[in-house]
């Protein structure tokens, strides 16, 4: 009896892996054994960096709030302390957006937090 192989599934599996490596340079994009390692590593980086992205954006928002707060004569830590003590419900993302897009409104928030 001849050896039977499920070539349809094998080709589909290889094609799926090769499609994930589209745009990779050299053998990383067309040699299956190298592609497997490249795709695995890319997925590891993607998994890790989805978590790092949250930290990166939070630090960006803090930098923007700090810069705008210092233009209004107060440090970031004192501003956030005042906002929490006054129970002003605004998150850092929204506060950073206001600081960049509407400095007058940000100045009003600073004034109301410090008064």
From Swiss-Prot:
Belongs to the bacterial ribosomal protein bL20 family. GO terms for biological process: ribosomal large subunit assembly; translation. One of its GO terms (cellular component) is ribonucleoprotein complex. InterPro entries: Ribosomal_bL20, RIBOSOMAL_L20_CS, Ribosomal_protein_bL20_C. One of its GO terms (molecular function) is structural constituent of ribosome. The gene is rplT. Coiled coil: none annotated. Pfam families: Ribosomal_L20. This is Large ribosomal subunit protein bL20. The keyword Ribonucleoprotein applies. Binds directly to 23S ribosomal RNA and is necessary for the in vitro assembly process of the 50S ribosomal subunit. It is not involved in the protein synthesizing functions of that subunit. The keyword Ribosomal protein applies. Keywords: Ribonucleoprotein, Ribosomal protein, RNA-binding, rRNA-binding. It comes from Chlorobaculum parvum (strain DSM 263 / NCIMB 8327) (Chlorobium vibrioforme subsp. thiosulfatophilum).
